[in-house]
Amino acid sequence: MTQVTVGENEGIESALRRFKRQVSKSGIFADLKRLRHHETPVEKYKRKLQQRRKARRR
């Protein structure tokens, strides 16, 4: 769960930017998009293959 605490002198805009950054780094939206539709075994294999290639490059 992503949480952002707003400081006393902090504007809501900067807190919202921090929240959006945390959500994008955690990959929540990517998971939601992936789980929105049924994934065939071939698609799952291709996705995992891409993840392995990306991890190997790092």
From Swiss-Prot:
UniProt key word Ribosomal protein: yes
GO biological process: translation
GO molecular function, one term: structural constituent of ribosome
A GO-annotated cellular component: ribosome
Keywords: Ribonucleoprotein, Ribosomal protein
Taxonomic superkingdom: Bacteria
Similarity-based family: Belongs to the bacterial ribosomal protein bS21 family.
HAMAP family: Ribosomal_bS21
Name of this protein: Small ribosomal subunit protein bS21
Organism: Prochlorococcus marinus (strain MIT 9301)
